[in-house]
From Swiss-Prot:
GO terms for cellular component: apical plasma membrane; chloride channel complex; cytosol; early endosome; early endosome membrane; endoplasmic reticulum membrane; membrane; nucleus. Residues 654-832 are annotated as: Disordered R region. Gene3D superfamilies: ABC transporter type 1, transmembrane domain, P-loop containing nucleotide triphosphate hydrolases. Residues 1472-1482 have a biased composition (Acidic residues). This is Cystic fibrosis transmembrane conductance regulator. The modification Phosphoserine is found at S549, S660, S670, S686, S700, S712, S737, S768, S791, S796, S814, S1446, S1458. It comes from Rhinolophus ferrumequinum (Greater horseshoe bat). A motif (PDZ-binding) lies at residues 1480-1482. ATP 1 binds at W401, G458, S459, T460, G461, A462, G463, K464, T465, Q493. InterPro entries: AAA+_ATPase (IPR003593), ABC1_TM_dom (IPR011527), ABC1_TM_sf (IPR036640), ABC_transporter-like_ATP-bd (IPR003439), ABC_transporter-like_CS (IPR017871), ABC_transporter_C-like (IPR050173), CFTR/ABCC7 (IPR009147), CFTR1_ATP-bd_dom1 (IPR047082). The modification Phosphothreonine is found at T717. ATP 2 binds at Y1221, G1246, R1247, T1248, G1249, S1250, G1251, K1252, S1253.
Length: 1482
């Protein structure tokens, strides 16, 4: 970054913002880079500001029982805030004085006051000086207030982040990541620009008092008629605002539903394509879009009427103020024009500035209270341990994650007994809820000597991770004592990678030791991986290590823990993502050898690890099931083995018995969504997280329309969808609605829905920060949105008369009432959705984009012509007013000759009053009617254009090849459907209309003034040209600065999420200060771009004002010096001149807004223009013998349910297959060739990242491929993509459950009747799972099916494959994270339903591979071996290395003799089961 010219700028340069000219020049000539941005001053640095506020907040905490954050802010910023408020007030006072001078100028042309004609020139000079004074007062004041708001935001950002790192885990379990992002983005954005409006809470009343005093002098009591009308108008607009909110509320639920489905589609686009669900998803989303658009139109119409009412009210304000006075006493022209000018200022103060100011204070104080509450939450306390011992001792330790759970349980029990539960299985309710009534750990006793290895095992939710958290001090014991040496190193169950190099991630701030580092790298099997990178271990990893495989991330996390020299190492399931061979090598070389002299506590689920551990602790439901050695385990706990053995007899049970066992076993996991498998904390479940049963669950999702729009979400909950009534409460955070035409809803993006364990529980579920840290969150069906990109400038809803820049700014800000971010957000994708990648879209929207947009709908051009025709009609109506003046001039002369010395010349007399009244009202009504006719068709048509563009973009994304989609972030795609479509729906129609109307008003006014004084036209032309040139000059730089600001905003939030995910690791390593420094750097980077944007914007606005002042000086003196008799002409010219330039100033700003919004259209067009998948693959369809291909075409078009001729056997032949993820990328698979016979089962073997899953994707034509694949002799080039994929059944690695009913999830095309679906559900053991929910097949699943365990979801995928009647089945890690019983269910179903099918299986479990006849071994992207298991075991191979000799002797009987099959499976289960303890008692 460069040094800022502001440091050496003169006072004049600072006053006129001339120091920004260098960056404006550079931005106009070339594309700006981050290096071009100026450095911030020390006063704006996050370090200084946070230190200053933190000092005052600590002082507030120490001195008072009830500390107030606003007091700390006041001590930091009050005097500067007050100073700029006074400047702002003085600038506003000049607006009230201007009409006085205007009246005096008009009065100087009074025929009876010829003596005053000589002072007109001086009055003109005074009027011009007032404009200059206003410019010099307002702009520094606005900029200063923006600057203070920015500093407040930075200081609070830092304070919140520091507090986040200190929060206790119990508090973090109650806070969602969305709440934290809301504090940082939504609440704090209110300070950034809203601070400039805060002073109007006292300025506006003073302004009204001053204006009413001046109007009283002119019109006496009649002036209050106009004020009363303005108050009524404000109330009317508030009513219209509430009506609009009603439509917004209704519409928000539909937007939510659409975006939930859309996000699920995008996140699982590979599964959608694999299942051939493109048409079903498109139809589903478009149906929701239709309903949404009906409500969008209604809201847009009300909003249009609202803003139009404000604009056209100008006629009636003046009319009602003047009429009573005129009827009683008559009125002169001077008073009319002066009244018009006063009423314009008065109307702005009453209907805009004061409501906005109250709203700003209401929002700001609410935000401060939220932040204050957050800053007072309980902090993490490091427990005081006995530092003299080198052992770990726990004595009768009991702990709860949630305090007061017993009371919560009793309340739930009372609710249940009182009959609040409408229907359903009560046993289900209590079997789930009983988990919460017990402590997470209870009566734990163990002792580990120095250098020993303690293996901790147990079923899911047994409390294994909680045990480690207890040792780390994250969980405080309720009873008992803990002792250990205190120096801890920790490896999380889910790998955490910070942005930086591999080396930085491993060293993690510890002093570098070359020998130790190399030893750790070798022991953690990272040498080979690092050697593949060109930069070796200096390769920079993205946030979360997204460029690495899961296994690589896990090994880096383990290496970080091992590298630190500690007394105690806590390893929480570090081998979860490793293949069998790698896991075996790391356990032996790293855990057993390298760390042999260290005390280690290892959470594991492997029998081999238990054998080699010095001590074993088995937990079951929070209690110690066993503590001792492995030999003692076999002797003292024989039931531990018998339970495993019992699983082998599972197939012998009846179907009802199997379903009962399955339901009872999985029921324990169903509460935590995907918490089955290795996720360890289902005790910290939704009941506890909600805090209380009746709490209304908040919205999830970061608003995609960053700082543009707010929507209120009111959506049917799943209970309501399923026919169960729910008590709805008004949200406690409803906003005070004072600004009638602002969008005061909540957010537009989806809400996760109710927990649905049946009809028995009406509590709410949300993802807490603790769940983010433990990854026990639902990672499907959630949305971010997304985007905290740079604010698009705010839009006007209606043209304004005689607006100052402050009025314009205020109006713009009203459309940005703050980004109301809801309580939740999808943590998994937050990093992707905070900003869009820097896209190849020009800084200024091209004319081609405008042309394409106009031609999207054939009627749009005609509507634009219609607007022009209406405009001409309005001009004609305006001529009536001038005719009126002309008609009254003779009467004026007559009246003046008949008048006495005490009577002024009048326009309206008692004899002509009613005649003039009817003409005036007629003109006003005509303009009102014409205005409505002009705008509504345009708004209606532009919303239709948005509908068409959404349809085209949705179709394009669904049918785009994966190679194209792989180059895009999910968040970037989702932003197109959320942020950009919302802009097209809401902002763009009214903003385009606004711009067109403003331009036409300016043209019309210039024409009228030029007709009255042709010389003024000569002055207007160069001024308009200057405006256009200035706009083009500024726009190039401003758009680039906003783009850089957007990029600078992203690291702030990604750093927050990164820190939260690794918070336990940060604390264990003591790296909080380092991460605070990184956060401050991110803040400073964003501050530099935002401050420069504010400065250049102020430069632009000030230059507009300066041009306006020059023009007004010219108009004033031309009109004064060239006008003879006729006060009316001078009044019209000066009044219109003031109106022209303020309107033209706003028109220029509006054009910038339109250009900014049209960038959303450019991005939508970019997605519409993506290549289609079919065109990429389709070649001429070759005829096939016996008409087989034509029957395939029937399958494609009609989704026939009967068995089709192709494929009939399932034979697969692959020749020279090469696959790439993206065009031009590296080959993931090279020259793969093999063949599979019909009905054969083939297992894929290979290390993590070798390309097994990639091969399955290539078979489905999801990648860029070369070579040939044939199924039953039919080449993939001779059939369509859809036909090809329907030949395969798929169980993907990432399970896809979209928001919808069970029926829709199993059969989205509606091909099968209920009888057939229930039959398949019986086959796969899914019936009892579905029957426990109300509505059965019609029960609505939400949030990626969070009420289902991972096992349930795998069964859903299995049922889909059975329904597909496919002859080829592809399975990608189907047993991942499954408990033994569900695993046995899936094995049995696969044997029965797919007995005659060809199966390709990618699996890490050795037992699962035993069903395969042949194995395909993939190494280094190529096929190394393709043989039977016996052949592979007899040769040196990867498969042989993974199996020990003793295991081989046990496995062979399974293949050679059916009599010994049972015993072999028992042995395999003993060795490989991931859950050692399962309670299957019914």
């Amino acid at each position: 970054m460069q040094r800022s010219p502001l440091e050496k700028a003169s006072v004049i340069s600072k006053l006129f913002f001339s120091w920004t000219i260098p960056i404006l020049k550079k931005g106009y000539r070339q594309r700006l880079e981050l290096s071009d941005i100026y450095q911030i001053s020390s006063a704006d640095s996050a370090d200084n500001l946070s230190e200053k506020l933190e000092r005052e907040w600590d002082r507030e905490l120490a001195s008072k029982k009830n500390p107030k954050l606003i007091n700390a802010l006041q001590r930091c910023f009050f005097w500067r805030f007050t100073f700029y408020g006074i400047l702002l007030y003085l600038g506003e006072v000049t607006k009230a004085i201007q009409p006085l001078l205007l009246g005096r100028i008009i009065a100087s042309y009074d025929p009876d006051n010829k003596m005053e004609r000589s002072i007109a020139i001086y009055l003109g000079i005074g009027l011009c000086l007032l404009f200059i004074m206003r410019t010099l007062l307002l702009h520094p004041a606005i900029f200063g207030l923006h600057h203070i708001g920015m500093q407040m935001r930075i200081a609070l950002f830092s304070l919140i982040y520091k507090k986040t790192l200190k929060l206790s885990s119990r508090v973090l379990d109650k806070i969602s990541i969305g709440q934290l992002v809301s504090l940082l983005s939504n609440n704090l954005n209110k300070f950034d620009e809203g601070l400039a409006l805060a002073h109007f809470v006292w300025i506006a009343p003073l302004q009204v008092m001053l204006l009413m005093g001046l109007l009283w002098e002119l019109l006496q009591a009649s002036a209050f008629c106009g004020l009363a009308f303005l108050i009524v108008l404000a109330l009317l607009q508030a009513g219209l605002g509430r009506m609009m909110m009603k439509y917004r509320d209704q519409r928000a639920g539909k937007i939510n539903e659409r975006l939930v489905i859309t996000s699920e589609m995008i996140e699982n686009i590979q599964s959608v394509k694999a299942y051939c669900w493109e048409e079903a998803m498109e139809k589903m989303i478009e149906n929701l879009r239709q309903t949404e658009l009906r409500l969008t139109r209604k809201a847009a119409y009300v909003r249009y009427v609202n803003s139009s009412a404000f604009f056209f009210s100008g006629f009636f304000v003046v009319f009602l103020s003047v009429l009573p006075y005129a009827l009683i006493k008559g009125i002169i022209l001077r008073k009319i024009f002066t009244t018009i000018s006063f009423c314009i200022v008065l109307r702005m103060a009453v209907t805009r500035q004061f409501p906005w100011a109250v709203q700003t204070w209401y929002d700001s104080l609410g935000a401060i209270n939220k932040i204050q509450e957050f800053l007072q939450k309980q902090e993490h306390k490091t427990l005081e341990y006995n530092l003299t011992t080198t052992e770990v001792v726990m004595e009768n330790v009991t702990a709860f994650w949630e305090e007061g759970v017993g009371e919560l349980f009793e309340n739930a029990k009372q609710n249940n007994n009182s009959g609040n539960i409408s229907s359903g299985d009560n046993r289900l309710f209590f079997s789930n809820f009983a988990i919460l009534s017990t402590p997470v750990l209870r009566g734990i006793n163990f002792k580990v000597e120095r250098g020993q290895l303690l293996a901790v095992a147990g079923s899911t939710g047994a409390g294994k991770t909680s045990l480690l958290m207890m040792i780390m001090g994250e969980l405080e014991p309720s009873e008992g004592k803990i002792k250990h040496s205190g120096r801890i190193s920790f490896c999380s169950q889910f790998s955490w990678i910070m942005p930086g190099t591999i080396k930085e991630n491993i060293i993690f701030g510890v002093s570098y030791d070359e020998y130790r580092y190399r030893s750790v790298i070798k022991a953690c099997q990272l040498e080979e991986d690092i050697s593949k990178f060109a930069e070796k271990d200096n390769i920079v990893l993205g946030e979360g290590g997204i460029t690495l495989s899961g296994g690589q991330r896990a090994r880096i996390s383990l290496a970080r823990a091992v590298y630190k020299d500690a007394d105690l190492y806590l390893l929480d399931s570090p081998f979860g993502y490793l293949d069998v061979l790698t896991e075996k090598e790391i356990f032996e070389r790293c855990v057993c050898k390298l760390m042999a002299n260290k005390t280690r506590i290892l959470v594991t689920s492997k029998m081999e690890h238990l054998k080699k551990a010095d001590k074993i602790l088995i937990l079951h439901e929070g209690s110690s099931y066993f503590y001792g050695t492995f030999s003692e385990l076999l002797n003292l706990r024989p039931d531990f083995s018998s339970k495993l053995m019992g699983y082998d007899s599972f197939d012998q049970f009846s179907a009802e018995r199997r379903n009962s066992i399955l339901t009872e076993t999985l029921r324990r996991f169903s509460f935590e969504g995907d918490a089955a498998g290795p996720w360890n904390e289902p005790k910290k479940q939704s009941f506890k997280q909600t805090g209380e049963f009746g709490e209304k669950r908040k919205s999830s999702v970061l608003n995609p329309i960053n700082a543009i729009k707010r929507f209120s979400i009111v959506q049917k909950t799943p209970l309501q969808m399923n026919g169960i009534e729910e008590d709805s409460e008004e949200s406690s955070e409803r906003r005070l609605s004072l600004v009638p035409d602002s969008e005061q809803g909540e957010t537009i993006l989806p809400r996760s829905n109710l927990i649905n364990t049946g009809p028995t529980f009406q509590g709410r579920r949300r993802q807490s920060v603790l769940n983010l840290m433990t990854h026990s969150s639902v990672n499907q069906g959630q949305i971010v949105h997304r985007s905290t990109a740079a604010s698009t400038r705010k839009m006007s809803l209606a043209p304004q008369e005689n607006f100052t820049e402050m009025d314009i700014y205020s109006r713009r800000l009203s459309q940005d009432n703050g980004l109301e971010i809801s309580e939740e957000i999808n943590e998994e994708d937050l990093k992707e959705c905070l900003f869009d990648d820097l896209e190849s879209i020009p800084a200024v929207t091209t004319w081609n984009t405008y042309l394409r947009y106009i031609t999207v709908h054939k009627n749009l051009i005609f509507v634009l012509i219609w607007c022009l025709v209406i405009f001409l009609a309005e001009v004609a109506a305006s001529l009536v007013a001038f005719w009126l003046i002309e008609k009254t001039r003779p009467q004026d002369k007559g009246n003046s000759t008949r008048s006495t010395n005490n009577t002024s010349p009048v326009i309206i007399t008692s004899t002509s009053a009613f005649y003039m009244f009817y003409i005036y009202v007629g003109v006003a009504d005509s303009l009102l009617a014409l205005g409505f006719l002009r705008g509504l068709p345009l708004v209606h048509t532009l919303i239709t254009v948005s509908k068409i563009l959404h349809q085209k973009m949705l179709h394009s994304v669904l049918h785009a090849p994966m190679s194209t989609l792989n180059t895009l972030k999910a968040g970037a795609i989702l932003n197109r459907f959320s942020k950009d479509i919302a802009i097209l729906d809401d902002l763009l129609p009214l903003t385009i209309f606004d711009f067109i109307q403003l331009v036409l008003i300016v043209i019309g006014a210039v024409v009228v003034v030029s007709i009255l004084k042709p010389y003024i036209f000569l002055a207007a032309v160069p001024v308009i040209i200057a405006f256009v040139i200035l706009r083009a000059y500024f726009l190039q730089t401003s758009q680039q600065l906003k783009q850089l600001e957007s990029e600078g905003r992203s690291p702030i939030f990604t750093h927050l999420v990164t820190s939260l995910k690794g918070l336990w690791t940060l604390r264990a390593f003591g790296r909080q200060p380092y991460f605070e420094t990184l956060f401050h750097k991110a803040l400073n980077l964003h501050t530099a771009t935002w401050f420069l944007y504010l400065s250049t914007l102020r430069w632009f606005q000030m230059r507009i004002e300066m041009i306006f002042v020059v023009f007004f000086v010219a108009v004033t003196f031309i009109s004064i010096l060239t006008t003879g008799e006729g006060e009316g002409t001078v009044g019209i010219i000066l009044t219109l001149a003031m109106n022209i330039m303020s309107t033209l100033q706003w028109a220029v700003n509006s054009s910038i807004d339109v250009d900014s919004l049209m960038r959303s259209v450019s991005r939508v067009f970019k997605f519409i223009d993506m290549p289609a998948e079919e065109s990429k693959y389709t070649k001429s369809v070759k005829p096939y013998k016996d008409g087989q291909l034509s029957k395939v075409m029937i399958l494609e078009n009609q989704h026939v349910k009967k068995d089709d001729i192709w494929p009939s056997g399932g034979q697969i032949t692959v020749k020279d297959l090469t696959a790439k993820y993206i065009d031009g990328g590296n080959a993931i698979l090279e020259n793969i060739s093999f063949s599979i016979s019909p009905g054969q089962r083939v297992g894929l073997l290979g290390r993590t990242g070798s390309g097994k899953s990639t091969l399955l994707s290539a078979l489905l034509r999801l990648l860029n491929t070369e070579g040939e694949i044939q199924v039953d002799g039919v080449s993939w080039e001779s059939v369509t993509v859809q036909q090809w994929r329907r030949a395969f059944g798929v169980i993907p690695q990432k399970v896809f459950i979209f928001s919808g009913t069970f029926r829709k999830n199993l059969d989205p095309y509606g091909q099968w009747n209920d009888q057939e679906i229930w039959k398949v559900a019986d086959e796969v053991g899914l019936r009892s799972v579905i029957e426990q929910f109300p509505g059965n097949l019609d029960f609505v699943l939400v949030d990626g099916g969070f009420v289902l365990s991972h096992g349930h979801k795998q069964l859903m995928c299995l049922a889909r494959s059975v329904l597909s009647k496919a002859k080829i089945l592809l399975l990608d890690e189907p047993s991942a994270h499954l408990d033994p019983i569900t695993y046995q269910i899936i094995r049995r179903a696969l044997k029965q339903a797919f007995a005659d099918c060809t199966v390709i299986l990618c699996e890490h479990r050795i037992e699962a591979m035993l069903e395969c006849q042949r194995f395909l071994v993939i190494e280094e992207n190529k096929v190394r071996q393709y043989d039977s298991m016996q052949k592979l075991l007899s040769e040196k191979s990867l498969f042989q290395q993974a199996i020990s000799p003793s295991d081989r002797l046990k496995l062979f009987p399974q293949r050679s003799s059916s009599k010994h099959r049972s015993r072999a499976q028992i042995t395999a289960l003993k060795e490989e089961a991931e859950e050692e303890v399962q309670d299957t008692r019914l």
